[in-house]
Amino acid sequence: MGEFLPLQGVRVIDVTTSLAGPYCTEVLAALGADVVKIEPPAVGDEARTWGPPFWHGESTMFLSMNAGKRSVALDLRRGLEVLIRLADGADVFIQSLRPGTAESRGFGPDALRERNRRLVYATIGAFGRKGPWREKPGYDPLAQAAGGILSLTGEEGGPGVRVGVSMVDQGTGIWAALGIIAALHEREQTGAGRTIDVSLFETTLALLSYQITGYLGSGEIPGRHGTAFASIAPYRVFETEDGEVMVAAGNDKLFAALSDVLKLDGVVDDPRFLTNPDRVAHRNELDEIIAAAVARWTTAALLAALEAAGVPAAPVQDVAQVAEHPQTTALGMVQALPHPRVPELRTVALPVSIDGERVGHRAPPPELGADTEAVLREAGYDADEISSLAGQGVVRVSG
């Protein structure tokens, strides 16, 4: 892993839970930031309990989103003074509480920037800071539903199907990280912080950018097409003798090459399939022809033949196949991060390389409260003060 640490020296106070906020701050930590994760003393981030799967008792969901951070176990209701002091020495403050909660408790952006004008303050919400849904709670599947994604996923005529990864959560985290980094860059010129707002709902709108533009331009409402792509055919998954293959014949030349490999005599010259608009209009008939031909091939043989003909195609692989694939290994995307409780821990690095070096995580995810004492000492608390706070249950000190 490379030593690309452009955010080295940046202190982040992270008051987020679940996935979107933690993924944002994991990215910042991998880029060099000192991320201080604030967690409730009793159980910590709720994601610590999400599972199975668990790895030696640790939630793999939590392990995958919190590498490189330090953990401070702090009761926000009783430890406001502690939180404010930590924010006084920070560059970034990020929270994912319901709208108005931070302000009502005294650690909204205005209150914190009165004391630290350089502070970049980021909020991750469900449906945005304005509008009739601003108070609604939300998780990734709710955003997928309300944001229109579920209207596009699933088989034609069937119910919506949740996308099998938390792409709205992680996408929102990436947008938050982008906004924070942009605000930090501007701060170098202005000396002042900014307030960043992102939400799951807004991320779904960005993900649906070309579908929304298409609707606004045509008045046509896109629907479900299974694994197919509405505007191109053939462009979908087909079943082989022993698996599934995604075929992407995105133009006339590729369609002709596919037809040649599958020995679809007369199909290229069939008036129903001459151009892509023709093929889209007669998608069902074309899919039946191709499906019957593909079913006679093994996955390996078909992929080899399509590759030789220059037709884009890929096997449908499961997570185990992807995690152990030589391509994944060659890219260095799976990283070992020895953890006190999970010595063989491996997780996924950032999908970015700088000068040929993978941007990876610098430390394993923290145990709850592992860094409370160290961080409080850095903020100016002495041993007696820390002991008093721990005795009152305001903080939890590990060990």
Describe every region a protein language model picked out.
Residues 129, 157-165, 188-204, 223-230, ...:
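Conserved Rossmann-fold dehydrogenase catalytic segment
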Residues 173-193, 206-218, 259-265:
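Oxidoreductase and adenylate-handling cofactor-binding alpha/beta cores
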Residues 45-47, 216-222:
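Short Pro/Gly-enriched beta-strand edge/turn motifs at strand-loop
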Residues 1-11, 223, 239, 321-399:
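Terminal low-complexity tails and localization/encapsulation signals of metabolic enzymes
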Residues 1-189, 367, 373-399:
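N-terminal helix-loop segment corresponding to the beta1-alpha1 unit
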Residues 42, 127-128, 200-205, 242-244, ...:
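Glycine-rich beta-alpha junction loops
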Residues 228, 233-309, 313:
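Aromatic-enriched alpha-helical interface/lid elements that frame and gate functional surfaces
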Residues 307-328:
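Conserved PLP cofactor-binding pocket of PLP-dependent enzymes
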